[in-house]
Structures are given as C-alpha cells and as structure tokens.
Amino acid sequence: MSDVIMVNTEYIPGKRIVKVFGTIWGITVRSRGLGGNLVAGLRSLAGGEIKEYTKMLSDARNTAMERLQSAAEQIGANAVINVRFDSSDIGQVMTEIVAYGTAVLVEDVTDNIQRVGLS
C-alpha cells in the first residue's frame, strides 16, 4: 500500500506544502471487446444499469489512481492535491480514464499555534 496522500482539496489539514512538483497523471485505456459490447448493447435495449460497463469503468478508475500514486512516488512526492478524473471515448469501443493532480511534498505542521475548533 502506498504512503502517498491523495486528496481532492487544495490543502491537507495538519500538513504544510514545502515543495510543488507540478501536474502528474495516471492514464488507462479500456475496451470492452466485441462480446462485452454485444451483451451490453442487448442490455441497453431493456434500460437500467449496464453492470459490465460499470465494473470496467470502476476498475479503470482504480488503475488510473494506482498509476497516479506511482507517478508521485517516482518523482519523490508524498502527496497529490486537487485530484480529479476525466474520461473520453476513443472511437466507439475504447474509453480513456485519466486521474490527475498536483504532486507535492508535505510535512507535518509543528507550529505552536493554538487551533480553535468549532463546537
């Protein structure tokens, strides 16, 4: 399991950004294949969720996130902020999933600042 922190916010509570590496991404392209497209096409006639595509896209999203974490580790980042996803179709049988964000190096905040919480 990776120690890279991944968040969709601009900061991480309790951490301070000490270095910004820049934008990084993890990409995967998936194809359902002829048999899967045929089954999904038949299911789409009846309406409702097409579970074959849902699983494929969920797996692709997880792969893109794993590749994003790996890209962060390779450049020495220990966190990725502003994580986002994008997808696009390539032709009629392939889908590209991209996970991207800003790779940063963070450290714990050790200031003697008293934090006031909301109650």
From Swiss-Prot:
InterPro entries tied to this protein: UPF0145_dom_sf, UPF0145_YbjQ-like
Disulfide bonds: none
Coiled-coil ranges (or none): none
Domain of life of the organism encoding this protein: Archaea
Pfam families in the record: YbjQ_1
Family as reported in the entry's similarity comment: Belongs to the UPF0145 family.
Name of the protein in its database record: UPF0145 protein Ta0182
Annotated organism of origin: Thermoplasma acidophilum (strain ATCC 25905 / DSM 1728 / JCM 9062 / NBRC 15155 / AMRC-C165)
